[in-house]
Amino acid sequence: MTSSKPKKTSRVRKTTKNSKKNNPVTMPALAKTPPSFKNKVVDKKALKNLVSWAYKTHGTAITAAMADNLKDLGFKYATQAAVSISVDDLKVPDAKQDLIGQAEEQISATEECYRLGEITEVERHTKVIDTWTETNERLVDAVKNNFNQNDPLNSVWMMANSGARGNMSQVRQLVGMRGLMANPQGEIIDLPIRTNFREGLTVTEYVISSYGARKGLVDTALRTADSGYLTRRLVDVAQDVIVREEDCGTERSIVVEAEDGKFGARLLGRLTAEDVLDAEENLLVPQNTAIDPALSGEIEKASINKVKIRSPLTCEANRSVCRRCYGWALAHNHLVDLGEAVGIIAAQSIGEPGTQLTMRTFHTGGVSTAESGVVRSKISGKVEFSSKAKIRGYRTPHGVEAKQAEVDFILKIVPQGNNSGKAQKIEVSSGSLLFVDDGEEINSDITVAQITAGAVKKSVEKATKDVICDLAGQVRYDKVIQPKEVTDRQGNITLKAQRLGRLWVLAGDVYNLPPNARPVISSGKSVDEGTVLAEASQSSEFGGQVRLRESIGDSREVQIVTTSMSLTNFKLIEESTHSGQIYNLESIDGISYRLNISPGSKISNGEVIADLTDERFRTKTGGLVKYAPGLSVKKARSSKNGFEVSQGGTLLWIPQETHEINKDISLLMIEDMKWIEAGTEVVKDIFSQTSGIVTVTQKNDILREITIRNGTFHECDDEEVLNRFTEEGNLVNPGEKILDGVDNKEILFVQKLETPKCRGLLLRTVEEFTIPDQAELPQLAHVKQEKGPYLGLKAIQRLTYKDGELIKSVEGVELLRTHLSIESFDATPQMTIDVESIEDKNDSSINRLNLVILESILVRRDTISDSSHGSTHTELQVNDNQLVKAGDVISTTQILCKEKGLVQLPNVVDDEPIRRLIVERQEDKIKIKISDKALVKVGDRVVDGDPISKSIKSTFCGEIEEVSNSSVTLRYGRPYMVSPDSVLHVKDGDLVLRGDGLALLVFERQKTGDIVQGLPRIEELLEARRPRDAAILCKKSGIVQIKQGNDEESVSLSVIEKDDLVNEYQLLVGKNLMVSDGQQVAGGEPLTDGPLNPHELLDCYFNDLKDQKPLLDAARESISKLQRSMVSEVQNVYKSQGVAIDDKHIEVIVRQMTSKVRIEDAGDTTLLPGELIELRQVEDTNQAMAITGGAPAEFTPVLLGITKASLNTDSFISAASFQETTRVLTEAAIEGKSDWLRGLKENVIIGRLIPAGTGFSGFVEELSSEAGPHPDILAEESGGYRRAQNLRPDYTVDMPQSPAVSSSAILDDPSDEDLETTRNRHGIDPSSSNFAAFARPNAENQFSEDQLPDPAALEGLQEEGLLSDE
């Protein structure tokens, strides 16, 4: 591999150190040209060029002085002129009104086309938006011209035009029009803001405009953070890229292609990879020459379209970039210096403009920008298509019928008759649109075609839009629509239009019928105003007694008492308390129930309506509850409401008074374990209620509780007796012996007690409460109908406390509660029970409680007709208090006709109820008089402008109903255009009201919704994210074969490869094909639309190439292809936002992302499968394998996103300081990694000088002593390794080292056979100078005599500091 030295030309100069600082050299080529006098207005751009030229020509000092002078000049005149903006400076161009008028005319013409059903709703929307966009652009031009011609010294214009402040888009909003705005969903609103800020916005416009303003503010805030993080990741991935070599000597290069014959700045500062020759093979630019603007211009003049240049992408310098491949440092436009940290410069150059990018994602709602590539006829003549022309019908997004070319061909316009002259030739590319037919004669300046740039199929997605009816009437389809029922995977049936056609709505008065109404008139009958069209009746479900209520709102309630129950033997007594009214029920025998409900309320089944207030089960104090055998309760999930008694019995109650004190012990006025009388003061101001023995509970000198237990205390020392009882207590039945001399005639509760002075038993009395099996129910009087729900009361007894529960209380508690709950069977959920208070029949002073189940029927009031309902008349068929049976009619409602006309009923299937009917009125028709023969027949549909007879054209749309010799009757109608595949919501003959949905238009729009722009897109690219819904890529090159499935949705796609292998591709629903049958495709080409997955793209390139080329070449070429596409993708995003970044910066970053490969099979090398390693390293390893005859490693190239690449860098210090510190450091420790401190970051962290700039020279010396890339390769100069660390662990030994090098871990040595095999495999002679690597030391880690090499080699090692003197 030879590297030719750069030929010295006037354009490249080599500078020695410091030459730039001391003597600014004038470049000889430029020195000869005399200074030219430029007499023109200097704006921002010209100023930039001027300063740049001065810097290149005269160096820093002169340029700085000139810039200073320019600043002073500017300030001087700015001060004199005192430029500022006043309202009068904002001059609105006169042409504005005309332009807006023209736009409105175009839009009303579009609306008219829509009204006539010539275009769909989508096409109308697209056309309107495009019209406004175009108007806005024309208005900007008008603003520019107005200022230029009428007021060139206008302050606003000067500022915007010179680039001092502001730009045209801001001026446009100040004096032009604000234009179209997007709504919060990102869709463009088709109502533009026509005014500007000078004229002032209307309220509506202001609100619309504030959407965008808010979005802008939020956007800016988010952008700064995102941009900063992007810069940090970029710096981390590229921080170790430093210019370390003069020339890497590579023969690889990249090709730069001219765009429209121009290279722009893309060649500047790059070195040519080979001689550039012109058309006559003359040498234009020698190899390795830096291209300056003059040379770039010469190359363009010579019409050279491709130039091979050197690039960081193809640089073969190890872990760095060489000067030649990098080219100029753009700071001073000279070849980059050694030691320049180009990685960090690249990272900052890409990250810094991030704040200028937008984050917005636009959903334009199917909007295509202004038509591009429109070709007009230059002459009049006859159109001729060439023989190979293939075209098909196409409808443009604006609804214009055109043709689309399927192949490339030539279209000629041939002059006819007297017009002799040259024919006009137009090259039509496939996908272009044609607006003329073959053989058609046309005039000059007619739009002939719209040419697309090559056969680029745009990525499209399906979107939908509703078609809303704006006229009530009957639906009719055009025959061409051919609706077809389609069943989807879920089994839902939808009706779809197969062809483009019209859906008509014919006018008429549509009546909505109530749910249970049925028509009483047949189809085709004439009706007058007030005729009954339909009747609806309401009937009772259960029957009962009718109550008529006062009307509420626009309906009247009829109540039917189905079941009622009166509590005749209870008085209803009302009490007033401060919290409101309380109602009690009192029986004759004095039992009182507290009502939980009040009259007038509604209750449901099972609800508790009253509680019995029973003093018999109330205690005087707290105590202990015990259930006697026989008493049982139902198990309940929660004990919140108590325990329901399932079987009655005896409840035992042991009284016990408990005072909760929580005061200081000093306040205690009695002694523990002493008997006290009722009324004793136990603590200051607290008195006992009962007599008994006191127990005091205290903690930390705080008095917690005082318990007073009733009963008598008997001293006893008999262990046997005491052991029969516990401190918790035992129940003793009457007659059972306790102690001598104690006669128990009733149940006692006995507890063992130990006082400080003596021991004994406390005998406590037990109270007994008898609980019945069933609670006593009040006597009721209830009604049971023959049909209807039953109503009754049920009493429930609930115990408040569970068995063994201790209630700590001074006041008494309620042990048993009796609840009254309502019980009703056969009641439907919507039937509620009403609570009423009624007077007693015999005594009006007494009120009784009455419970009734009501069936409530709302009867509609009579209504006057409105747009969707006819007038109704409702009649009640029952009287108050009348008894009705189940199924009796309560009311009938009649729907009356509003106007005279002809009734039509819709077609219904089976017994489907009729919900609408239509009356065709006189005003829905028009009679058109004709004098000659009619050209239409009954049933024809005509639109505005269609001929009815030879002399008369229709001025309306509709359907012909009658044709006679003198007149034609037309029924008004409204056509709606529906596109193929639209979903139809209505059937032929259906009746619709205004506002109903007729169809859902399915249309294709360019995928703009998902075109993520700006920063998120840059991030997506640099992080190599896998996009959602990615395109399907061709795995290997071949010929496409497309087969149509049974239903129109399913398409099978396969590619026939070289060896006749057929590769089938699974197509997902909604994916559009980007290829046609029989087309030749290459590996990596997208077969369907959608964003490209970069990882998959790399795999496809690699798999396609590795069958044709050696593994290494395939990897290099596939990586190179991916690199080029990534650089151009990133550039496109920045360019679209008007940000210029030099390619080389992006190339440095992309190089870092694509530098690694994944080992698939290690062969005989010491690499590990799955390991990520640099391609260069693998290349060297495989070369060594080729020499030794071992099996090479197999690998696949990988693409790493910037975050992943940063974490996979060779330096673990750099990776750990970036992200996931613990994981990175742990892994590095386990693997025993070494960090060579190559990058800037590692050195900064450790606190050394960084190996860039002035610190670079020291680093070069260090590098020269450093080991090569991998143990399997022998370094060239010394014939072997000198550092033990660089070796693989399986043959590493400890070895004396110079202090500069850290010692690595000692690992187990392989057995002698292994050692021998390793030596043989690598062709290594044990006596070579890297003997330490492959020799085996003895136990003391010393080498034996025969292991040591000859003294000369030893001396060499000692000199290098690798062996100590011993």
UniProtKB/Swiss-Prot annotation:
Low complexity bias (residue ranges): 1354-1366
List of residues binding Zn(2+): 248, 315, 322, 325
Gene Ontology molecular function terms on file: DNA binding; DNA-directed RNA polymerase activity; zinc ion binding
Superkingdom in the source lineage: Bacteria
Keywords: DNA-directed RNA polymerase, Metal-binding, Nucleotidyltransferase, Transcription, Transferase, Zinc
Class in the EC hierarchy, top level: transferase
GO annotation (BP), single: DNA-templated transcription
Keyword Cell division part of the UniProt annotation: no
Catalyzed reactions: RNA(n) + a ribonucleoside 5'-triphosphate = RNA(n+1) + diphosphate
Cofactor annotation: Zn(2+)
Details of cofactor binding: Binds 1 Zn(2+) ion per subunit.
Region described as Disordered: spans on this chain: 1-33, 1291-1366
Enzyme Commission number(s) of this protein: 2.7.7.6
InterPro entries: DNA-dir_RpoC2_beta_pp, DNA-dir_RpoC_beta_prime, RNA_pol_Rpb1_3, RNA_pol_Rpb1_3_sf, RNA_pol_Rpb1_4, RNA_pol_Rpb1_5, Rpb1_funnel_sf
Regions of compositional bias (Basic residues) in chain numbering: 1-20
One annotated Gene Ontology cellular component of this protein: DNA-directed RNA polymerase complex
Function: DNA-dependent RNA polymerase catalyzes the transcription of DNA into RNA using the four ribonucleoside triphosphates as substrates.
Family note: Belongs to the RNA polymerase beta' chain family. RpoC2 subfamily.
Assembly: In cyanobacteria the RNAP catalytic core is composed of 2 alpha, 1 beta, 1 beta', 1 gamma and 1 omega subunit. When a sigma factor is associated with the core the holoenzyme is formed, which can initiate transcription.
UniProt name for this protein: DNA-directed RNA polymerase subunit beta'
Species this chain originates from: Prochlorococcus marinus (strain AS9601)
Designated gene of the protein: rpoC2
